[in-house]
């Protein structure tokens, strides 16, 4: 028998006003793990992928089509850009991610969001965290919330060293919908009875895949879409 599930975006949905990656960067800079060279590398990679700096095609990470100018810039220089990780050891990053969770994420974790997660778990609905953030950044939160699944960006690792690339397309926009549909098929989730929570208009494909979409702290575009479609709106 198929069963409903609950899907949560993380950044600015469960974590208020910021992202797991921003929290990680703050912690890494504070501890001297990431210096100016890493940030300049990220800047250069972003310029390359925007076509504003020379680079062979294989060195450019793809930017989703149809993004607004400011969203495109954010994607190019942070959310889709992992060049700053190049050369770091995976184990060290996992340890740093746990420190970032304790120091930066927990104080910003929505109390109401935690209550909603717990209520869905108590109702027997598996909780799936589906996020564009890196998997090792999401794992401490998955453990803390006792979520059943974490679907996240997977960094490429060679001999224990991060390359600054992802192994699969970045979970963003339409790609998040594809991942939701895939896990639903694999696990036998009834999407018409399932819930999804997200904050950004690029999450519309993700939200409209379930019977109970919820716009959380929505940006102006998502708020308008949610109001037009009669979706639930909440502020955490």
List each language-model region with its residue ranges.
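C-terminal cap/substrate-recognition subdomain and adjoining C-terminal extension
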Residues: 1-5, 91-98, 102-236
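Short, charged N-terminal helix-start/capping segments
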Residues: 33-68, 118-149
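Short linear elements at protein peripheries
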Residues: 25-26, 49-107, 111-118, 123-125
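Active-site neighborhood of HAD-like aspartate-dependent phosphohydrolases
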Residues: 1-58
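Hydrophobic alpha-helical segments and their boundary regions
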Residues: 40, 76-78, 215
């Amino acid at each position: 028998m198929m069963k409903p599930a609950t899907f949560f975006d993380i950044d600015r949905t469960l974590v208020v006003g910021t992202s797991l990656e921003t929290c990680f960067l703050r912690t890494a800079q504070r501890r001297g793990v990431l210096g100016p060279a890493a940030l300049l590398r990220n800047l250069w990679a972003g310029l390359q992928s925007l076509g504003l700096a020379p680079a062979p095609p294989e060195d450019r990470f793809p930017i989703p089509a149809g993004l607004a100018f400011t969203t495109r810039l954010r994607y190019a220089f942070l959310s889709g850009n992992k060049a700053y990780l190049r050369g770091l050891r995976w184990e060290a990053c996992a340890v740093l991610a746990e420190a970032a969770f304790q120091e930066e994420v927990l104080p910003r974790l929505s109390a109401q969001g935690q209550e909603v997660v717990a209520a869905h778990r108590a109702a027997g609905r598996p909780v799936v965290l589906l996020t564009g953030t890196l998997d090792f950044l999401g794992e401490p939160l998955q453990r803390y919330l006792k979520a059943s699944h974490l679907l996240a960006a997977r960094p490429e690792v060679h001999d224990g060293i991060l390359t600054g690339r992802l192994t699969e397309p970045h979970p963003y926009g339409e790609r998040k919908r594809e991942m939701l549909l895939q896990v639903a098929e694999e696990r036998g989730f009834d999407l018409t009875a399932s819930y999804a929570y997200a904050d950004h208009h690029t999450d519309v494909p993700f939200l409209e895949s379930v019977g109970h979409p919820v716009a959380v702290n929505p940006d102006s575009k998502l708020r308008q879409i949610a109001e037009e479609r009669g979706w639930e709106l909440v502020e955490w």
